[in-house]
From Swiss-Prot:
Family annotation (InterPro entries): aa-tRNA-synt_IIb (IPR002314), aa-tRNA-synth_II (IPR006195), aa-tRNA-synth_II/BPL/LPL (IPR045864), Anticodon-bd (IPR004154), Anticodon-bd_dom_sf (IPR036621), Pro-tRNA-ligase_IIa (IPR002316), Pro-tRNA-synth_IIa_bac-type (IPR004500), Pro-tRNA-Synthase_IIa_type1 (IPR023717)
Domain notes: Consists of three domains: the N-terminal catalytic domain, the editing domain and the C-terminal anticodon-binding domain.
Lineage of the organism: Bacteria, Pseudomonadati, Pseudomonadota, Gammaproteobacteria, Oceanospirillales
Top-level taxon in the UniProt lineage: Bacteria
Protein name, per record: Proline--tRNA ligase
Main location: cytoplasm
Record keyword Protein biosynthesis present: yes
Length: 573
């Protein structure tokens, strides 16, 4: 491609409304332009990268045996009502009514459509397993679209759906997709982790997220320093006691005593005013119970409640709803800053770390008073114990190997075992080998294709601009003929070299614009072309070309005859 024929709309200034690096650089590099809130036009440079991501995804999905289909973006309300998600999905669902007063939605996902297709096309277990995927535009009516294409309303997604006759088959399909995702993100050149995750609103059981590690990531990624264990913050667990220690509760050393604490409405104030170590305090949080009334959840004062773990408890109503102060006072007779387990007449569930505490402090369920020296089984019967908290840096890994570290991540892929959630709701059955109708077991597997582009930039950039991995750069090589408008020799050599490199399978941009070299170099750095070759009269006099990798600080002079092999060694396909 000739730069003179390419729309290169680079910007020197950073747009004021771009908050994160990927959004800033995609605008400055002329990859995207904003049309409206959460809606973006992909310009030629951006589209080249987007298509390369799509191609890698498509190749690996095909390699894994999935079949490509293309389903409508607009979906009839009847399917969503059948699955029960028409009302459940809420305002994220863009609802449309046609001229005949029929309700539709612009699909944010396609579980209903693919289930409808399969229940009409697949009749027998002999047609299984089957896996279908598409790469298609979705729409979610985000309240606050932000961060450019990272959290846009319209986006491109690869979504796949597997169908099996039994759990063993579903596990095989799931494992095949997991392996395909590992290959995809490795080929994309990303530093990522596959982490255990909660299924959330999708439903079902068994789930992994694929997180690109980046300081700007919205998600906390937890991984062990001594093993392959990794999970997101919602799913991550830790051993209840440090490595090498037996998880036993120390014997009581203190008597229970009631203390006036008139101004201690928070853990921090209690610790500051009364000298109690924070790890000897308890937070009592009250939530709505699944059978009505309130349920008390207890975590250590220096820990935070994990709301996903709490919501998954059978005793807790979903979605998780914290009790209001009015509800708490009506049930207990005290406010939120004075709650604790002693004489508390409601169901209690305590975190595993709380179960190991002795001589601790907590509210007395009387405004302005706390109990100190509380001990389980002496002062309060030991209630139900569960994993309720977020892990913290340095916690022992749940597999007993190493400790937990926390990094930031950007979710770019997610795989789920859905089970029969949709097939049961929508009566998608097949005949098994006994001739009995059984519901299909489903898996679903998504990759945010547009988000991958932004995540790659968040992980690969410097002060000069984007640093693309070779596999998804809009161009692998930039050829820069110096003074080509004056030197016929440089111009002819550049044209010949361009053709040779293109014939060798490289994706090449020849910068034939009538601009100063510094402007061309700055554009190429901003755009992120990973390899640059400069052709000049002085170099040709010595049968040399100037090479500079995007991450290199210095240039390298390469013999003209050896350039092809030199580039082949450096460019990762």
């Amino acid at each position: 491609m000739r730069a003179s024929q390419l729309l290169i709309s680079t910007l020197k200034e950073t747009p004021a409304d771009a908050d994160i690096v990927s959004h800033q650089l995609m605008l400055r590099a002329g990859m995207i332009r904003r049309l409206s809130s959460g809606l973006y036009t992909w310009l030629p440079l951006g589209l080249r990268t987007l298509r390369k991501v799509e191609n890698i995804v498509r190749e690996e999905m095909n390699r894994a045996g999935a079949q490509e289909v293309l389903m409508p973006s607009i979906q009839p309300a009847e399917l969503w009502q059948e699955s029960g998600r028409w009302d459940q999905y809420g305002n994220l669902l863009l609802r449309i009514r046609d001229r005949h007063e029929r309700d539709f939605c612009y699909g944010p996902t396609h579980e209903e459509v693919i289930t409808d297709l399969v229940r009409n096309e697949i009749r027998s277990y002999k047609q299984l397993p089957s896996n279908f995927y598409q790469i298609q535009t979705k729409f979610r009516d985000e309240t606050r679209p932000r961060f450019g294409v990272m959290r846009a309303r319209e986006f491109i997604m690869k979504d796949a759906y597997s169908f099996d006759i039994d759990q063993a088959g579903l596990q095989r399909s799931y494992d095949a997709m997991y392996d395909a995702y590992m290959r995809i993100f490795t080929r994309l050149g990303l530093d990522f982790r596959a982490v255990e995750a909660d299924n959330g609103d999708i439903g079902g059981s068994g789930s992994h997220e694929f997180q690109v590690l980046a300081d700007s990531g919205e998600d906390a990624v937890i991984f062990s320093t001594g093993s392959d264990y990794a999970a997101n913050i919602e799913k991550a667990e830790a051993l209840p006691a440090p490595l090498g220690e037996t998880p036993e509760r120390p014997a009581p050393q203190e008597e229970l005593r009631l203390v006036d604490t008139p101004n201690a409405r928070t853990i921090a104030t209690l610790v500051e005013q009364h000298g109690l170590p924070i790890e000897k305090t308890i937070k009592t949080l009250m939530v709505h119970g699944s059978e009505g009334g309130l349920v008390a959840l207890l975590v250590r004062g220096d820990h935070e409640l994990n709301e996903v773990k709490a919501e998954n408890l059978p005793e807790v109503a979903a979605p998780l709803t914290m009790a209001s102060e009015e509800e708490i006072r009506a049930a207990v007779g005290a406010g939120p800053g004075s709650l604790g387990p002693v004489n508390l007449d409601m169901p209690l569930i305590i975190d595993r770390s709380v179960a190991l505490m002795s001589d601790f402090g907590a509210g007395a369920n009387i405004d302005g008073q706390h109990y100190f020296g509380i001990n389980w089984e002496r002062d309060v019967a030991l209630p139900k114990v569960a994993d309720l908290r977020n892990v913290v840096e340095g916690d022992p890994s749940p597999d007993g190997k190493g400790t937990l570290s926390i990094a930031r991540g950007i979710e770019v892929g997610h795989v789920f075992q859905l089970g029969t959630k949709y097939s049961t709701a929508m009566n998608a059955t097949v005949l098994d080998d006994n001739g009995q109708a059984v519901p299909l077991l489903m898996g679903c597997y998504g990759i945010g294709v547009t988000r991958v582009v932004a995540a790659a930039i968040e992980q690969n950039h410097d002060a000069g601009g984007i640093i693309w991995p070779d596999a998804i750069a809009p161009f692998e090589i930039a050829l820069v003929p110096m003074n080509a408008h004056k030197s016929e020799r440089v111009r002819e050599y550049a044209d010949t070299l361009y053709q040779q490199l293109s014939d060798a399978g490289f994706d090449v941009l020849i910068d034939d614009r009538d601009l100063r070299p510094g402007v061309k170099f700055a554009d190429q750095e901003l755009i992120g072309i990973p390899h640059r070759v400069v052709i000049g009269d002085r170099g040709l006099d010595n049968d040399e070309l100037e090479y500079k990798g995007r991450r290199d600080s210095d240039v390298t002079m390469v013999p003209t005859e050896g350039l092809l092999s030199f580039l082949r060694e450096r460019i990762t396909k």
